[in-house]
């Protein structure tokens, strides 16, 4: 199978509304739902939840 099918690149957008994004890869078999990760948002200088954007 192609690499892109198993581990697609996804954008994680800040829930703080700053528009800051991270780009990462996820495994669809382990995480079929949207990812929500706590990451650092340098715009507001805090750790906030980042949600997968579709």
UniProtKB/Swiss-Prot annotation:
One of its GO terms (cellular component) is cytosolic large ribosomal subunit. Gene3D superfamilies: Ribosomal protein L33 (2.20.28.120). One of its GO terms (molecular function) is structural constituent of ribosome. Pfam families: Ribosomal_L33. The keyword Ribosomal protein applies. InterPro entries: Ribosomal_bL33 (IPR001705), Ribosomal_bL33_CS (IPR018264), Ribosomal_bL33_sf (IPR038584), Ribosomal_zn-bd (IPR011332). GO terms for biological process: translation. Keywords: Ribonucleoprotein, Ribosomal protein. The keyword Ribonucleoprotein applies. SUPFAM superfamilies: Zn-binding ribosomal proteins (SSF57829). Belongs to the bacterial ribosomal protein bL33 family. HAMAP family: Ribosomal_bL33. This is Large ribosomal subunit protein bL33A. The gene is rpmG1.
